[in-house]
Amino acid sequence: TTEIYTLSLHDALPISGPLNKGLYGKALSKKIWDLKVINIRDSAEDKHKTVDDTPFGGGNGMLLKPDVLAKSIDQNINIGERIFYLSPKGKKFDQKIAKDLVKEKYINLICGHFEGIDERILSTRNIEEISIGDFILSGGETAAFVMIDSILRLLPGVIGNEMSKKDESFENSLLEYPQYTKPLIWDKKSVPDVLLSGDHAKIKDWRLSQSEAITRDRR
């Protein structure tokens, strides 16, 4: 059985309906695959179940807190399993990656919300950033559905040998820079000093250089 875990801010994947019907539904009943939805809020320890905070260095929006997300991961995902964070600045998801993931017994998908997540969680939990395209969604659940759909149709016993190939191109643009939120020091890793300097010009230059480096590396 291929086990797919989605970490979300919902108790159920909002658009999972089609996965329970048709060929996928039959494959689900045959235990060829299974879907488990984990609510990240369940790992928040305060009474308000807070999962987000403001970014260091200023900026719009909120970020998912690394301590809460790390706890959710550690409680539900085994060490060594591949973990993907659905992000516009991630590596582009394609058919080649889908075919590669079919070989995995466990596929873990973090559905992003707000402006993103604290950069430190990516390295400490070996999370791979992945994107379904150069556009913005209101939440990562839709992107997770796209990945799940693409992977399921390749599983033996689901749709036989039928496969599709898709070749897309995107506009060249800079990807987002790393972001950080509280706590200041987490898992022995600190926020970059420039974001604490209060020098908006330096922060702007740092973010630009980071974006350029990430874009060169990933696009």
Stretch-by-stretch model annotation:
Residues T1-L13:
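Short, small-residue-biased leader/transition segments that mark boundaries at the very start
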Residues L63-H113, D118-E119:
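S-adenosyl-L-methionine/SAH cofactor-binding core of RNA-modifying enzymes
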Residues I121-M163, E168:
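Structured adenosyl-cofactor binding patch, chiefly the S-adenosyl-L-methionine
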Residues T142, L154-D193:
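Internal, active-site/partner-interface "lid" segment
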